[in-house]
């Protein structure tokens, strides 16, 4: 696969390195350096990663629309800014939709925007024995297939989240997670129960495990020797872990917002 990367920052380096290891041809270009943005766009005959911050990514893509005609465009940008980690596209089109409007002849797929750049450097990103899932939003099935392959080549599992019109939900999820992780120092994973309990008390909804990318459902409740129902320990543990990570003595660590997906710092 020939992959062009627009941008030379952290996301370009992390994902580009992984794809080179997988045997793909990769060329990254920027505003300065040996390769230009136009050269990278021309090179990416199979896929082009838009590793540029918002709103610059929309302007750059629009300026290269002739070179990007018919290309698969992988958008990893997050429109998050300010001390409250506000979603700057709130109330309007998502970043992915704005890119699609700027380059209407290309096929945009939203992906790789939910994690810190260092997660994409892991080989592979596996947590608690399970590979990381990467939500994808796109309208073209051929483009989605290309990006699914690129996700798997990073060691992750692709998870279809809908068409480009749903990319705004994924971008809003990124804003929420960044707010919880960085702003509140909270364990964001604790806001969601284990899948067996996601549909209420029964836990009997028949969804193939391959679609969930999670273990098969377990009983919702257990019965102790005296016949009293008690909550599954896993659920209780998740509920207790829903607050801040650590205590008041926890050392504060500054985490740049632009480290999540492609953020607000121009590369």
Regions found by a protein language model. Give the residues of each.
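NAD(P)+-binding Rossmann beta1-loop-alpha1 motif at the extreme N-terminus of oxidoreductases
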Residues: 1-39
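Active-site-lining helix/loop region of Rossmann-like oxidoreductase modules
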Residues: 6, 129-217
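Rossmann-fold NAD(P)-dependent oxidoreductase module
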Residues: 14, 18, 102, 150
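Rossmann-like NAD(P)-binding element
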Residues: 37-83
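Rossmann-fold NAD(P)-binding glycine/threonine-rich loop
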Residues: 77-118, 122-126
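Short linear motifs in low-complexity or flexible loops
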Residues: 216, 225, 233, 238-242, ...
């Amino acid at each position: 696969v020939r992959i062009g990367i627009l941008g030379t920052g952290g996301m370009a380096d992390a994902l580009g390195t992984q794809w080179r290891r997988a045997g793909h041809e990769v060329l990254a270009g920027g505003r300065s350096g040996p390769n230009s943005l136009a050269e990278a766009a021309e090179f990416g005959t199979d896929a082009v990663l838009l590793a540029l911050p918002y709103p610059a990514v929309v302007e750059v893509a629009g300026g290269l629309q002739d070179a990007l005609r018919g290309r698969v465009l992988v958008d990893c940008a997050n429109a998050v800014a300010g001390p409250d980690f506000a979603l700057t596209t709130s109330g309007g089109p998502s970043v992915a939709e704005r890119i699609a409007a700027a380059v209407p002849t290309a096929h945009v797929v939203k992906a790789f925007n939910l994690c810190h750049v260092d997660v994409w450097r892991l080989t592979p990103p596996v947590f608690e024995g399970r590979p990381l899932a990467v939500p994808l939003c796109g309208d073209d099935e051929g483009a989605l297939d290309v990006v699914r392959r690129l996700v798997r080549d990073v060691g992750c599992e692709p998870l279809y989240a809908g068409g480009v019109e749903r990319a705004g939900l994924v971008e809003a999820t990124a804003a929420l997670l960044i707010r919880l992780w960085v702003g509140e120092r909270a364990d964001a994973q604790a806001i969601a129960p284990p899948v067996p309990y996601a549909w209420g008390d029964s836990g009997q909804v028949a969804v193939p495990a391959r679609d969930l990318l999670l273990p098969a459902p377990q009983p919702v409740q257990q019965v102790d020797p005296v016949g009293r129902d008690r909550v599954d320990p896993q659920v209780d543990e998740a509920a207790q872990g829903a607050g801040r990570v650590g205590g008041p003595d926890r050392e504060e660590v500054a985490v740049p917002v632009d480290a999540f997906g492609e953020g607000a710092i121009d590369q």
